């Protein structure tokens, strides 16, 4: 009996190991990824601890500047529709945050908002941009409102697109896509870290759009490949597990300190961050403008690119740069 049990146990072990080896995927060198996902607008900024940030800088150099930061596991590619819309009239800088896209990781440092804020500052300083409008989606939205509190003197405007930051209720946590719930389990993270997660990535992306048909094979391949850049899987797991840098949660008292003109955008069919969180941001930030998009998911900048970019343009014209120009004219000597 014992021998039979041992034989079954060993057979199952061999099958599981063979399956793990079949699904296991090695890192993809940055040089190989850059050949596919960089373009002629790509730039790189190196600083201490082996950090190398990938960003793109397009549009007139003397135009008002907009800096765009993406969400968890995404890359600057999420902003391409907005960049195409805005680059004629604005200087548009999109950034791959540390541990994402084509950016490296900072050695021996916890990944999180402080790193992201430092990265935004370093890129802006390198480009000699003193003031700008900062837009962030999801995790990038959390980085954006934290930046607005840390460096209010640098912001002309703030744009929060399905931004993260408010504490989740138990129901909201249970309703999130499967891939995010799995990644919160320590054993699942250890098993999944080196595996091909394309099917889970596809499911997560389909949950991110109001229309799941928006997800393409090319999009899934990009997310899966960039996650396999050296150090990226470790960084992503560190972020989702909460083992990275401590993140502060949004509160009405905290957000009341934001002084930049603010636009809050949120898809009403966002399965990752409920639209009620967008309403909370708009209620807490003084003078914030709220736009909700019925039927739209977590990524309005992609799903309804033309409409959301048009709303951004209107905000910049009426609430940010148009207002500033009127103020400058009012104080100009005759």
Regions found by a protein language model. Name each.
Residues 58-102:
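Conserved HGGG/HGGXW glycine-rich cap/lid loop of the alpha/beta-hydrolase fold
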Residues 258, 264-266:
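Short beta-strand/loop motif that positions the catalytic acidic residue
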Residues 48-49, 56-58, 94-139, 310:
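Active-site loop/oxyanion-hole signature of alpha/beta-hydrolase fold enzymes
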